[in-house]
Swiss-Prot record:
Signal peptide: none annotated. PROSITE patterns: RIBOSOMAL_S13_1, RIBOSOMAL_S13_2. The keyword Transmembrane does not apply. It comes from Bifidobacterium longum (strain NCC 2705). It comes from the Bacteria. Belongs to the universal ribosomal protein uS13 family. Keywords: Ribonucleoprotein, Ribosomal protein, RNA-binding, rRNA-binding, tRNA-binding. Part of the 30S ribosomal subunit. Forms a loose heterodimer with protein S19. Forms two bridges to the 50S subunit in the 70S ribosome. This is Small ribosomal subunit protein uS13. Located at the top of the head of the 30S subunit, it contacts several helices of the 16S rRNA. In the 70S ribosome it contacts the 23S rRNA (bridge B1a) and protein L5 of the 50S subunit (bridge B1b), connecting the 2 subunits; these bridges are implicated in subunit movement. Contacts the tRNAs in the A and P-sites. Gene3D superfamilies: 1.10.8.50, 30s ribosomal protein s13, domain 2. GO terms for molecular function: rRNA binding; structural constituent of ribosome; tRNA binding.
């Protein structure tokens, strides 16, 4: 397995797909990177030369914020929003959806498993 940006990328996949294993690199950014470095998107990772891997690594590090740097930046942005007490920060703090989604129903991923609350007892006749 080749390593790019501290991530093992699978040998059997096409390089266009394998690059998406790196946090911060999706399909579009992978295509842009390959076009800029002159590497065919159809080539498999195992068929890349060391020179091509070095070119890819240098291009990604020079032009994009990926992996650890990007994760730190995202975490810092969330902490800043929480600290300045803006609406999005309040939603992050409460563990609720941040971007305006409904919460009366759904939002289970963000809210966690359902906690049953005791309700009214039915009146017997």
């Amino acid at each position: 397995m080749a390593r790019l940006a501290g991530v093992d990328i699978p040998n059997e996949k096409r390089i266009e797909i394998a690059l998406t294993y790196i946090f911060g690199v999706g399909r579009t950014r992978a295509k842009e990177t390959l076009a800029a470095t002159g590497i065919s998107p159809d080539i498999r990772v195992k068929d890349l030369t060391d020179e091509q891997l070095i070119t890819l690594r240098d291009y990604l590090e020079a032009n994009y914020k990926i992996e650890g740097d990007l994760r730190r930046e995202v975490d810092a942005d969330i902490r800043r929003k929480i600290q300045i007490n803006c609406y999005q920060g309040q939603r992050h703090r409460k563990g609720l959806p941040v971007r305006g989604q409904r919460t009366k129903t759904n939002a289970r991923t963000r809210k966690g498993p359902k906690r049953t609350v005791a309700g009214k007892k039915k009146a017997t006749k």
